[in-house]
Amino acid sequence: MPTWNREALAKRAVESILKQEYTNWELIIVDDCSPNYLNLQGFIEGLADSRIKYIRNDYNSGACAVRNQAIKLAKGEFITGIDDDDEWLPNRLTSFLKDQHKLHQHAFLYADDYICDTSGYLSLESLRIYPKPDYNQQLFNKKNIVGNQVFTLTSRLQTILFDTQLAAAQDYDAFYRLAEQYGGPFKIKMATQILYVNHGEVRITASRKKFSGYFSFYKKHSSKFDKSSKKYQLFTLYYIRKKPMSFRVFRRLLCLRNVKRYMMLHTVFKDKKF
């Protein structure tokens, strides 16, 4: 679990791991040189739980480098991650472990998420589910359909690691390379994580570098994309950059999916789902 300057949220994430039905886990927390860290450090020390390892770096190295640092230290057979502003349901590890045999044929496992757009919730029933499609290579060529976390063999992720040269789309890139090397992933049929999307604190992934990161991802992998996927990716880049699209460019990127996306963004159909 990478963390930076979000003590209260990180505590909630840790508490959700402590509530796991499956108890034979290790948690590696890497603090990327947070200026405010004493409360979190004291909280971890107070738990006196040998399964939890807390490391605070002496300098800020970035989210990808911190993730790689934790991945390299992992000792278990399987590995997954958690962002410091998210929360696991008690059955998350158990659910993945029930399907661990799928990793003989699939690169990794992934699941649906619950979405919370406030600081808290009363019950799971009050949250909406963010549904993810079953794996499809063509769809994965167009966008990240698996989300921000996966469950896989530790040895695989230690081989792949996150690309520290990417300013954004690091998850997409790492999971894409995992699928390339070890086979398409498998989706389990339940939601096991809560993503908090409006907690009001600094968001690590929000920066002006988003366009640069996605453009670098496109250049890195575009030779593997068919024409339709390239059009979809390029439309996404225009959207991220918030650059007006000329009619000439729109014609060049014309495909059914992009027409639907354009309608969602610019017309009375913007509230529709496609």
Residue ranges of predicted features:
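Conserved donor NDP-sugar-binding/catalytic core segment of glycosyltransferases
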Residues: 91-124
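Conserved short acidic donor-positioning loop in nucleotide-sugar-dependent glycosyltransferases
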Residues: 5, 17, 32-35, 61, ...
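Conserved nucleotide-sugar donor-binding catalytic segment
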Residues: 130-211
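Acidic donor-binding segment of Leloir-type glycosyltransferases
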Residues: 14-56
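Short aromatic/hydrophobic "clamp" motif used to bind/position activated sugar donors
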Residues: 79
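C-terminal subregions of glycosyltransferases and related glycan-biosynthesis enzymes
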Residues: 15, 19, 180, 189-274
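Glycine-rich, basic loop-to-helix element that forms the pyrophosphate-binding segment
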Residues: 57-74
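The conserved acidic donor/metal-binding loop of glycosyltransferases
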Residues: 83-87, 112
